[in-house]
Amino acid sequence: MKKLIVFDLDGTLAPSKSSLDAEMASLLLDLLGVVKVAIISGGAWLQFEKQVLTRLPQDKSLSRLSILPTCGTQFYQYAGEWKKLYSDDFTADEKQKIVSSLEKAIATAGFHIEKTWGEAIEDRGSQITYS
């Protein structure tokens, strides 16, 4: 018997940036009754709250669920409330260097975005995302 099943969030459990539908939430709860489950995604913790946790009952079944935001560079588990067990965050200097390099590469490539939905370069603490 498997001890842990790991899923990607976007495009696997739910469409990209969308909440779990009722059927998937029910199936996930059933699975948590049998085995531990982890969900990983490139999104930040807030994205998991919106897409997953609002669709599940906040009860002891969540103690079998692990959440791995920002491609696994953060790790959350439930023990009556959600606790961050680790976060491999960049230092302020590392963030500045990454953002500066991204901005330089974008300018060098002559890439210009007409319209964005939020920040094009997003600081997720343990991940800098360009989208």
Language model features with spans:
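A generic structural motif
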Residues: 126-131
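Active-site phosphate-binding/coordination module
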Residues: 19-120
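Asp-based phosphoryl-transfer active-site loop
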Residues: 2-19, 39, 67
